[in-house]
């Protein structure tokens, strides 16, 4: 992951290009989330403590985990994807905890009680976990979004990708 790659802001809604597959839309969200974290890391390394890129990326990642657990994984569990889905759910819990840790440190950065090196380490940890997770999820799980989901499940996932919002207070089960 390069800090020099262009970043795309993560929004609460992802516009799906009409010819875009579900796999492509899900991967695009991954790139935007990674880009937000990378942008924050780059700024922090230069002495800029603007939290917006990290806050947006964490909000986007939480929403992304929700959409996978609510819309993508349930129908895939009914196929032969039980073991890979189990791994993804476990890793979602690890990612959620890493986001919580980074968010706590971000609050401490606001009052300057957390140093930049600690914050950078937390962000790199989150990015490393994301890289490991995405390297499995993208080639194994995401192709099934287009191949194995029913038309109604695909439509529901596409609609959420375009305009869905995570319920307030939702936490992935593996983080509880």
Label each PLM-derived region with a short phrase:
Residues 1-176:
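Small-residue-biased structural context
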